[in-house]
Amino acid sequence: MQAVNIIRWIDGPVLVGDSPGSKPPSERLQDTMAVSDPPVEAAGEASATRSGFWALTLGSIGVVFGDIGTSPLYAFREAVSHAAQQGTVTPVIVLGVLSLILWSLFIVVTAKYVLLLLRADNNGEGGTLSLMALGQRALGRQSLLLLALGVVGASMFIGDSMITPAISVLSAVEGLKLAAPEFGNYVVPLTLLILVMLFAVQSRGTASVASAFAPVMALWFVAIAVLGALHIHEDPSVLLAVNPWYAIHFLLNHGLIGLVIMGLVFLSVTGGEALYADLGHFGRKPIQAAWFCLVLPALLLNYFGQGALILAHPDAIENPFYRLAPAPMILPLVILATAATVIASQAVITGAYSLIRQAVQLGLLPRFEVRYTSETHAGQIYLPRVNILLLIGVLLLVLLFRTSSGLASAYGIAVSTTMVADGIMGFVVVWKLWNWRAATAAALVVPLVVVDIMFFSANLLKLLDGAWVPLLFGLIMVVLIWTWRRGAAILIKKTRRTEVPLLDLIKSLEKRPPHIVKGTAVFLTSDPNFVPTALLHNLKHNKVLHEHNVILTIETAQTPRVDPSERVRMENISEKFSTVSLRFGFMESPNVPKALVIARKLGWQFDIMATSFFVSRRSLKASAQSGMPVWQDRLFIAMSRSANDAINYFQIPTGRVVEVGTQVII
């Protein structure tokens, strides 16, 4: 096995290189679709039947496209209304904004994500952290630049996961003001109620309603397509916006305002990053089919329909999306829009859970408590602390901005940051992993990254108008990850000074053996070359040694999943000592007892009822010479104390565990 530099956890796993011979497990259908997991090849298309392929395609419509699919509620309105602030709505403004939206969807979403990055799968999986791990593997070493890009991109996704539910649900509920103006004062309270209910049901899982996600979202896309198509005839000149010159002309003639409008046009592509993040759930071809066959045409028809409506009726700028519908249909459309935004929010929340779990597995964050909400789908998880923090953030955003127009100013900066990070890491993959010439890779990827940077710059102009909020959330995540990694590295360095090499201890015990007791003792450690703290304390205080002693290390590979045949590595180092290494992918939940069943098949006579697991629990105290500022020392210690203990995280039976407490000064 070719290893890369390692990242160690406190009493936890190690990040290791993947085995060249490892094989990806079968692809699984998105967990939120309440159907069984079909076996599919890598990204899930080759072995799927035609019906299975279209089931995956329909499933992706219900999960992948919720965010970008609800953008017509506010994106076009915000861009045109800001462009027309100095006067009336003109054809130049409408055609310019429409052209910008159309070509943004073509370049950012279609070219970059649908056609390029969906091919950059990490054993079938996608997402910012998966792309980071893929880039590290392509380079064959740890890269601080890639690590920084992955951390920043993932952190900004968390910031975005707070604002997406807020703006989506709020923009949907605002339709009530058209259906029944007297309900205008109840928009914010109703939005808060819906969001609280959404987060409250997370602990129960979504399996019972997940099967309805795809049909509802499919109905949503059909509805917005029909509504848009019915109005294009009011001013067919909007079709001229297909010509990119209208976008270029608009930017050239509007100066700084044009750049501000670009930041609002970007709202039409937010959610594009979800296409890559959900690659592992559905596969490349089903996502591409859903995009080209339904989602993209529906979005374009709706945006062009809004444009034609505004040219024919300039007063419709107040809420052009809902004005597309006849008066009797506004209330049903509000209900459908609310359902669509709740589904979009659910997908973002689930994505945040998954991303946090990946970060924990990669050693970027402390262990969070993970609860499983489904007996049949391992991907349906619930993180209580993360759920509470997300809910607080979402409610604060609604109370702070109170309208979707206000939130629109805050939206985009986090997503654009993630997209820039994805683009740069994508270049590394195209260049190093796909073995393209640097010039060819640059010719393909650099123009896409330049567009991302333009959108990022445009969103920076909204910093004082509210964009600082998601940026602040993202920066807090960056600080937490930086503190955890830095503190863990310092802790490992300090504890290494006092650790005893395992082979030296074994030789010493052979010369002067202690009292031997029956049974097997398993000692968890992050480095099998040194004596676990729990073993030293057992010898020091209990003065006994078990018949069989297993030094157990849990490692996290740079691949999403590890094939069961690659799960366990065993080595006998003496008559009484052996080492066992368990490898898990960064998208898997470590289950030690299940993994040890594989060890039994390899010849280890393992009886869990005659086995004791020894785990050390460290109590940290700060020192003036830690190498970190005092505030960071305290933050690291607080994060360490809040971490879920190894017993629960690795699903070890509590009745077979012996905990040994130690105090460490960092």
UniProtKB/Swiss-Prot annotation:
It is found in: Cell inner membrane. It catalyses: K(+)(in) + H(+)(in) = K(+)(out) + H(+)(out). Pfam families: K_trans, K_trans_C. The chain crosses the membrane at residues 53-73, 89-109, 144-164, 181-201, 212-232, 247-267, 291-311, 324-344, 381-401, 411-431, 441-461, 463-483. One of its GO terms (molecular function) is potassium ion transmembrane transporter activity. It comes from the Bacteria. The keyword Membrane applies. GO terms for cellular component: plasma membrane. Keywords: Cell inner membrane, Cell membrane, Ion transport, Membrane, Potassium, Potassium transport, Symport, Transmembrane, Transmembrane helix, Transport. It is a multi-pass membrane protein. Transport of potassium into the cell. Likely operates as a K(+):H(+) symporter. Belongs to the HAK/KUP transporter (TC 2.A.72) family. This is Probable potassium transport system protein Kup. It comes from Nitrobacter hamburgensis (strain DSM 10229 / NCIMB 13809 / X14). The gene is kup.
